[in-house]
């Protein structure tokens, strides 16, 4: 909830930005085109994140630093605003803040799809997963997860440079996000109960066709909840990927971006309520025992 109220610190002082700079230096010093070198990189980054959480000690502060739901919504709505004005060039210019695909040549529908998919995936990465790991492991869990996810975004690509070096970071992120992605699908179904059956069908039958074991779950859940059809052809660094269709609805359009942001916020609120109830439940017996 602190993230919703205050947002993230400026990039110049944000600890995650500093972590990214440190890992860039580590890559320059230790890069080899091998999985072993990449595993060392991943282990170093994870250790830094966990260590930072242990030093910080405050789970609340660590969770606020690891969460980026407000900035996600702001970036997504910014694209929607320029799309509504018919400014395709402006929308393409804003897109790299949300997705890694090539924006050149994308039409309005493809830009809208990219943003909705990003909101779905980042609801896991930037909202649910940090809170989940904070609940499980405290401050080390929150910042350790954020470190893992940041490394995946930096080196977990299928490009020639990172196919081997980024393998360990990508797999570590897959493991760390596995449960949070499925929790996100459950919360999405709870937030849109009239679409619950369609959401679980999409997660069960369509998500396995996505190359990511976690992003596919979130995107399938959001597609079904919003009555959209996501997936299709994407281009990354000039390399085309054709992804399985997710959802059985219509193509996305600009007006669906605010709907996706509202859904992400509803998921966040449900998660906050769930965690508050769990905390109250665990505190209750202990308080009774003291009496």
What are these regions (language model features)?
Residues 1-291:
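Short amphipathic, positively biased membrane-proximal segments
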């Amino acid at each position: 909830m602190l993230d919703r109220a205050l947002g993230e610190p400026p990039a110049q002082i944000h600890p995650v930005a500093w972590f990214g700079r440190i890992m860039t230096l580590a890559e320059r010093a230790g890069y080899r085109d091998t999985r072993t070198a990449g595993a060392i990189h991943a282990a170093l980054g994870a250790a830094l994140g966990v260590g930072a959480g242990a030093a910080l000690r405050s789970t609340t502060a660590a969770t606020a630093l690891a969460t980026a739901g407000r900035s996600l919504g702001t970036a997504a709505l910014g694209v929607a605003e320029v799309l509504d004005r018919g400014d395709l060039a402006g929308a393409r210019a804003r897109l790299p803040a949300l997705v890694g695909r090539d924006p050149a040549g994308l039409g309005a529908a493809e830009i809208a799809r990219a943003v909705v998919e990003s909101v779905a995936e980042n609801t896991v990465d930037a909202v649910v997963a940090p809170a989940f790991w904070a609940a499980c492991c405290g401050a080390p869990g929150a910042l350790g997860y954020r470190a893992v996810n940041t490394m995946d975004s930096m080196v977990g690509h299928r490009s020639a440079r990172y196919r081997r070096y980024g393998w360990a970071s990508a797999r570590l992120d897959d493991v760390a996000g596995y449960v949070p992605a499925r929790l996100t699908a459950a919360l999405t179904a709870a937030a849109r109960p009239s679409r619950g059956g369609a959401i679980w069908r999409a997660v069960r039958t369509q998500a396995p066709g996505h190359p990511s074991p976690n992003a596919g779950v979130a995107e399938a859940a959001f597609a079904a909840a919003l009555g959209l059809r996501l997936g299709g052809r994407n281009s990354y660094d000039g390399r085309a990927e054709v992804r399985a269709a997710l959802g059985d609805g219509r193509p996305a359009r600009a007006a669906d971006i605010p709907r996706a942001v509202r859904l992400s916020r509803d998921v966040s609120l449900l998660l906050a309520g769930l965690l508050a109830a769990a905390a109250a439940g665990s505190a209750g017996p202990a308080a009774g025992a003291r009496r």
